[in-house]
Amino acid sequence: MHERYVPADVEAAAQGDWRAADAYKTQEDAQKPKFYCVSMLPYPSGKLHMGHVRNYTINDVMYRYLRMNGYNVLMPMGWDAFGMPAENAAMANGVPPAKWTYDNIDYMKGQMQSMGLAIDWSREIATCKPDYYKWNQWLFLKMLEKGIAYKKTGTVNWDPVDQTVLANEQVIDGRGWRSGALVEKREIPMYYLRITQYADELLNDLDGLGWPERVKIMQQNWIGKSFGVNFGFPYELDGEKQLLRVFTTRADTIMGVTFCAIAAEHPLATRLAQGKPELQAFIDECKRGGVAEADMATMEKKGVATGFSVTHPLTGEPVEVWIGNYVLMSYGEGAVMGVPGHDERDFAFAKKYGLPIKQVIAAEGHTYSLDAWQEWYGDKDIAVCINSGKYDGLGYAAAVDAVAADLKAGGFGDKQVTWRLRDWGISRQRYWGTPIPIIHCPSCGDVPVPEKDLPVVLPEDLVPDGSGNPLAKSEAFLNCTCPKCGAAAKRETDTMDTFVDSSWYFSRYTAPDAETMVDARTDYWMPMDQYIGGIEHAILHLLYSRFWTKVMRDLGLVKFGEPAKNLLTQGMVLNETYYREDAAGKKTWYNPADVTVTHDDKGRPVGATLNADGQPVVLGGIEKMSKSKNNGVDPQVLIDQYGADTARLFTMFAAPPEQQLEWSGAGVEGASRFLRRVWSFGYANREALASRAGFDAAALGDADKALRREIYSVLKQADFDYQRLQYNTVVSAAMKMLNAIDGAKGATPGVLREAYGVLLRVLYPVVPHVTYELWKALGYADEFGPLLDAPWPKVDEAALEQAEIELVLQVNGKVRGALKVAKDASREAIEAAALADDAFAKFGEGKPAKKIVVVPGRLVNIVV
């Protein structure tokens, strides 16, 4: 054992042992309870960031603690390897996305291994490998057979210069990110998955999940079950009688309708624009720009009057029709009723264009004004109908019932449940993704690729140039034979949304070598007992993976309907930001490592200068680590300087897993200092610790008893905190233990050895390298086996027993001392001891006690 703690040597030695023993290879074991813990698989972007380090360390701590407690634990890892960033990098570097991706995987895997993570690498998957995405294609074809997958036209962002489809994030201020051309909305054929078929189940099954409440609420809102009325405004056009259908949850305000707005893509808009250049120009404008719902929500609301009116179904009055850029054709009916008196968006629209505003609900104690919107205008819970004829005086529910009944009687509509959730469009006009297994035949139409011909392999040698999909230009990929008629045909060149790849990878981990999509091993491990990932995945990934799991269940592939029993969303890692701003307002951000900060006498930052030139920089505050703010910390630099255990210890100690973590260089140094203390104590006391000296618990002296009592008391709390996933307080407990051991003057070698052995096991899940090596060097491994499989220490309840307890002594409610009494002392004995104590003689001022309050096990208060 070396005198000095050298992290690089310690970690290399421990990892060498683990590799030699294949320590983390896991098999199914019916004799043990299983625990399957999974970190969301990373995108191979090039390097790990501190968010990765935190996520994987949380998982690793969980793995090691549960393995010590007798569980059969599995922690796998893989790579979410398809996606647009690889294409962008390929264009920038002139290399195929495959090379960029595989190089990054190699580097990041090495980083993970240097962290000492308990990953079973025999189960590693990369979603860009044919043996994985074959099953994306296979399940897609099964869904096609069952009608869950289908084809229809969908709206995309089209760059007319690059002749390519753009993702929403590639549209910047309405223009293509590369070409700068005005983006158009275009309708193209796409494949969809019928997730709406599972809407009720997706909503109801949230109740049984051990997921954070805010994640459940986000999914509930995204699924968006709404109870309302679907009805139509009648109109006649070119001799045809039709209904302009809308859906509303506020049928109680129907008498306040003063206009209707329709989407630019609505069939009525197309017909009304014929021969009207100004209408067509506005429709074309609406079709440019992004199609993301978030963009639609924040952009300026614009509209154009069509000059056409529909008829109010209950009053018979004409209602003017407008085309609005805020109306989504993909949501509801592509048309909305405008009630500016009681809808904030409609109110702003009406004020902008001078449309009538009519009040049709009132609330006691509130005054209505047309001048400015007030929140209560849209509050259905306090609303009573006014100016609504026969509905006057009705509250929300009664008014909706009455209006719905009248609309139904007139043949205009009825009550309806609708969903915000839309079917999942999986077609992407991109190269680096799972090929959609469809062949286009001039005679037979769209023909599914036969199962025997799967996978449709994506060529890995193409280099995208930004002008269209490379697959459409690859004759070798494109040209094929129709499996039905044998004629020359073309392959589908769209690839699948990368959320498909991440919707079931956790099931493939359980059977990575299976010749079927999954097998019996999947039902052993799944569902995941713990899933760990960022809150940013709360909706799409987590919702799609739940849907995919239910489809697999319904196809008889698995026996479970939810992918994860429990979810932990770890907090973001934050760091200080520093910048300079030029005359044009452009900010240049500087990494905290390149900045020197000055503090006031209370330790608060008051200024900062750039090390390169000594000139001031602006303190930008604490924000999430990101490339854009240049405030990240490279985990590899941290590991090279301090060791993986220090990085792990700091990330676990600085904050509870679900809370934000503020980066602190001083905190990292403190973590390193603590590990040096643990090592130094072991080295300084190596003879006593390695002595294997035993002891008779009944014959121990006070110093030994006190140390054992403290160690086991803290162990009990640490065990509880491990179970609650509160790893920051586990580290606090270990620090208390070390202080107790270090300060235990007069403790005998046997008790010291026991206490230090408990400390090593408590710390091991958090800092496995240093504890593993100390355990081995000090002879614990010879006695109890390697720390990898050493059992979790059991609390010796007898050691917690005390002959005496200490009570707080108060006089007139103020703490004046402490009182030692027998643990089983009677109330009378406690009162007598309190009155006899020097503190009462000193602070009682010679007065007799009026009353003595005894709180058992805590305090005595003498009132004079």
Curated annotation (Swiss-Prot):
Annotated S-S bridges: none
InterPro entries on file: aa-tRNA-synth_I_CS, aa-tRNA-synth_Ia, Leu-tRNA-ligase, Leu_tRNA-synth_edit, M/V/L/I-tRNA-synth_anticd-bd, Methionyl/Leucyl_tRNA_Synth, Rossmann-like_a/b/a_fold, tRNAsynth_Ia_anticodon-bd
Catalyzed chemical reaction(s): tRNA(Leu) + L-leucine + ATP = L-leucyl-tRNA(Leu) + AMP + diphosphate
Subcellular localization, as worded in the UniProt entry: Cytoplasm
GO molecular function, one term: aminoacyl-tRNA deacylase activity
One GO process term, biological-process aspect: leucyl-tRNA aminoacylation
Main location: cytoplasm
Residues that hold ATP according to the record: 627
Class of the enzyme per the UniProt entry, highest EC level: ligase
Motif ('KMSKS' region): 624-628
PANTHER family: LEUCINE--TRNA LIGASE, MITOCHONDRIAL, LEUCYL-TRNA SYNTHETASE
Name of the protein described by the UniProt record: Leucine--tRNA ligase
